């Protein structure tokens, strides 16, 4: 299942005065992303501040993105949690909205399941879901790593179509690509590893940087796929300072800062995250401005 090459892990626009998910700002952001290189969107993922969104806010967010998108980009809804039964129930509810192409299911966090528990969790969600499932492996946040052998087993299930790999382990990612079918999609979960993962056979990126350099991310991937490896590598090197700068403080505060500076109003982050201070903002803006020199 082709979900796109540059899939943006979309921030959630918040009204700065009312502290509510803002439909007008969602509409503006979705159009901006699609016009600037995104062929897919992840909604209510980590970058979308899912831990601080209520159930009703997520549903409101999904509905507005579906309406604005109008079938243009692939939509992947973040419906995972560390509670299998709750994940299944929420995934079913989201499927009934229509207009969602797949769900992103994060590895259960905090309760630290072993590999058998991880397999059983994803298998149960897959069996119950009418929507295709993308596994999200992010051991830096979930504490547990979904081992390659577990992902390879899960890839054999008919409704599990891909993985967002944020482990940063190219050996493991290479093994997954080598031992799964060609239609199993392997996405980099780190902007800075997009090109290396493409080089070992990956399919694209679920990106944060694409909020501000989406066209450049597309250009890099397309250059690589045309065999213009040196051009792709040059773009990668040029974008690398920004990719790293967007994680200089906890995500998505830097991304929201740059979008707001560019006139794409997405509001603040929610506590316990905090917005950039003046010094942090100045440094980040300088990195972005340096790309055009």
UniProtKB/Swiss-Prot annotation:
This is 4-hydroxy-tetrahydrodipicolinate synthase. The keyword Cell inner membrane does not apply. It comes from Listeria monocytogenes serotype 4b (strain CLIP80459). It is found in: Cytoplasm. The keyword Phosphoprotein does not apply. It comes from the Bacteria. The record marks 46, 110 as: Part of a proton relay during catalysis. Pathway: Amino-acid biosynthesis; L-lysine biosynthesis via DAP pathway; (S)-tetrahydrodipicolinate from L-aspartate: step 3/4. One of its GO terms (biological process) is lysine biosynthetic process via diaminopimelate. It catalyses: L-aspartate 4-semialdehyde + pyruvate = (2S,4S)-4-hydroxy-2,3,4,5-tetrahydrodipicolinate + H2O + H(+). Pyruvate binds at residues 47, 206. The lineage of its organism: Bacteria, Bacillati, Bacillota, Bacilli, Bacillales. Catalyzes the condensation of (S)-aspartate-beta-semialdehyde [(S)-ASA] and pyruvate to 4-hydroxy-tetrahydrodipicolinate (HTPA). The active site is at residues 136, 164. PROSITE patterns: DHDPS_1, DHDPS_2. One of its GO terms (molecular function) is 4-hydroxy-tetrahydrodipicolinate synthase activity.
């Amino acid at each position: 299942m082709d979900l796109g090459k540059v899939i943006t892990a979309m921030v959630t626009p918040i009204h700065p005065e009312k502290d509510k998910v803002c439909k007008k700002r969602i509409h503006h952001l979705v159009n901006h992303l699609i016009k600037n290189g995104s062929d897919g969107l992840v909604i209510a993922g980590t970058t979308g501040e899912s831990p601080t969104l209520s159930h009703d806010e997520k549903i409101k967010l999904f509905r507005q993105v579906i309406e604005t998108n109008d079938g243009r980009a692939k939509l992947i809804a973040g419906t995972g949690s560390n509670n299998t039964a709750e994940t299944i129930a929420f995934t079913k509810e989201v499927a009934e909205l229509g207009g969602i192409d797949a769900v992103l299911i994060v590895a259960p966090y905090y309760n630290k399941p072993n590999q058998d528990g991880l397999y059983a969790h994803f298998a149960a969600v897959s069996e119950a879901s009418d929507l295709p499932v993308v596994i999200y492996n992010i051991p830096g946040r979930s504490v547990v790593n979904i081992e390659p052998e577990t992902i390879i087993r899960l890839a054999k299930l008919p409704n599990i179509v891909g993985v967002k790999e944020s482990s940063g382990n190219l050996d493991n990612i290479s093994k997954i690509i080598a031992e799964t079918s060609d239609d199993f999609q392997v996405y980099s979960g780190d902007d800075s590893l997009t090109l290396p993962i493409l080089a070992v056979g990956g399919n694209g990126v679920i990106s944060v940087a694409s909020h501000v350099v989406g066209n450049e991310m597309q250009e890099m991937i397309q250059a690589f796929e045309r065999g213009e490896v040196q051009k792709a590598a040059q773009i990668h090197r040029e974008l690398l300072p920004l990719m790293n700068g967007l994680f200089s403080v906890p995500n998505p505060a830097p991304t929201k800062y740059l979008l707001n500076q560019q006139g794409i109003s997405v509001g603040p982050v929610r506590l316990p995250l905090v917005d950039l201070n003046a010094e942090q903002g100045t440094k980040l803006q300088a990195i972005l401005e340096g790309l055009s020199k």
